[in-house]
A protein has these predicted regions:
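Glycine- and charge-enriched low-complexity intrinsically disordered segments
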Residues: 122-140
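A generic structural signal for solvent-exposed, polar alpha-helical segments
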Residues: 29-31, 120, 137
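N-terminal capping segments
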Residues: 1-64
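...with weaker cross-activation on analogous glycine-rich loops/strands in unrelated enzymes
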Residues: 55-126
Length: 140
């Protein structure tokens, strides 16, 4: 299996696990759970995500990791790349409500994750303007 085929297979497995699930702090349906599952599909052994049931709980867990933001947390585990270098299966961060949102990059500005205009986890095709808001990208 080529590197690209492996990335596509991991991204499809992540999509199958999360697509259609509404965002839910208490049911482990958040972007950090999405990223951790995806990283495992890509062969990374990340620590388990402790249980949290609210945005406040998530903030406390970030502080316990010595970071304030999700991009800072990603910097601890993955090499940062320019958004233009993203391949299928890489991680992207975009501004969100209260937190930055982490998404899995597909192709042609399509990302898997939760979006303010969607009720559940889905593939979001970003406009050029939306894509330009990318706050960070990481090679998985």
């Amino acid at each position: 299996m080529t590197e690209l085929e492996r990335r596509v297979a991991a991204t499809q497995a992540t999509q199958a696990r999360f697509k259609g699930k509404p965002f839910d702090w208490a049911k482990q349906a958040t972007c950090i759970h999405l990223v951790r599952f995806h990283a495992a599909q890509m062969g990374h052994a990340l620590p388990l995500v402790p249980r949290f049931r609210s945005a406040l709980g998530a903030k406390k867990l970030l502080a316990e990791q010595g970071v304030e933001t999700l991009p800072e947390l990603m910097d601890k585990y993955f090499p940062r790349i320019a958004p233009a270098q993203m391949l299928v299966g890489d991680i992207a961060a975009f501004p969100g409500e209260g937190f930055d949102a982490l998404m899995i990059y597909g192709q042609l500005r399509a990302c898997l994750g939760w979006h303010q205009d969607a009720d559940d986890c889905q593939i979001v095709r970003l406009s050029e303007e939306g894509y330009s808001l990318c706050k960070g990208a990481w090679r998985v």
